[in-house]
Structures are given as structure tokens and as C-alpha cells.
Amino acid sequence: MNKKFQSLRGMNDIDPSGLSTWKFIESRIFEIFASYGYQEIRFPLIESTDLFKRSVGESTDIVEKEMYSFEDRNGDSVSLRPEGTAGCVRACIQNGLLHNQTQKLFYSGPMFRRERPQKGRQRQFFQIGAEAFGFPGPDIDVEMLFMTSAIWSHLNLSEVLTLNINTIGSLDERNKYIETFTDYIKRYESDLDDDSKKRLTRNPLRILDSKNVKVQEILADAPIPVSYTHLT
């Protein structure tokens, strides 16, 4: 084959020697999912771009900079999926799987983001995910934690991984933090890069994701969310 035909940057092959390990990991995870009552669902690699704009957020780096989007022959904007949750939810709604019923579903497959390839981060990467719908209360969240712990244990990862649990607080707490954070950032508006200025009017909290050095310096003294969250 002509040497100029190579895999695209950040999109790697999996040869037979690596595939056996890959299949072992998948099978163990799928077995654990099944033991907790989760069923597999499959959905397309390509979805309407608007689906991800709505679910992930128009002002996020994923939507603005990282998605592989293009127009099809009908002029519709479509995108390779950058994550699995949006497609899973869309499939459930479209197929009537959420009407007056609970669902436990899992999926796996390639996702795509045009990031800078580096160790542990590729432009085509594989995601295994589990979603639960229609369960009231926090019990299902606890079950997810137990399921994750079981996966780590079966793959001998418990000693090398740490689980950190985050919270964005209640709606009132979050709104109060957004107001305080926005007031703080506005004091430095003239020092913000163009992306951050845009986010200031559309979704101020996205500024926290900025990799701009100057913005990072401003954020160093910004109010932090945990100060506005009251856990009981």
C-alpha cells in the first residue's frame, strides 16, 4: 500500500494482539452491567448537530471546537458523536422507552472529538456508559457507585483509581454562585480573551474551562462553587 495512506491523526488501529485484552475488559464490564439489570442499547455514530448543541451546550469547547460536523447532501448539519449520553436519550425518547417505565441501559463504541492527541486522549476514543431513567431518589446513584466499584475491583484497578464526587449544589445555590462569579469576572472583562468574552454573556461558568493563561490567572482568585454549596 502507498505509504501516504495512514490512519488519521489521533485515530488508531487495534491489532489482534491488543484486541484480546480489549475484549476481556469489555466482557467483564458487560457482565457486571447485566448483573445489575442493565440492557445494551445501540444507536448511530452520526446524529443531528443540534442534538449535541442542546445536550452538551452551544458554548462548550466540545460543540464550538471539537466536534466533527459537516453538512450532508440535503444541507443538514450532522456530527460524529462526541459522547454517548445524548444519543442514548434521543433513542429512548424516539422509541418510546421512557413512557411510564424505568430503564437501565448501557452502550459502548467509538466517540469522536478533534482534540490535540496525547497520552490517554485520542480523536477517536471508545466509551462505555450506563444510563438509568425514571428512578426517583438517590438510590440509583448509589447503585451506580457500587457498580463502578465492582468494575474497578474485577479489573484490579481499585488500588490505582480514586473516585471524586462533585456537586453543583441546588438551583438556588447555583444561581447565587453564577451571579457572584459573573460580577467578579466583569471586573476583568477587558483582560479576557474573545472566547471568554463570548461566554460571559452566554454561559459565564464555561469561562472556568478556559485554557488561556491570562484567564487562568484571573480565575485563581475567583469565588469557588463549594463556598456556595451547603451539603446536609
What are these regions (language model features)?
Residues M1-L231:
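TRNA-recognition modules of translation machinery and tRNA-sensing kinases, especially anticodon-binding
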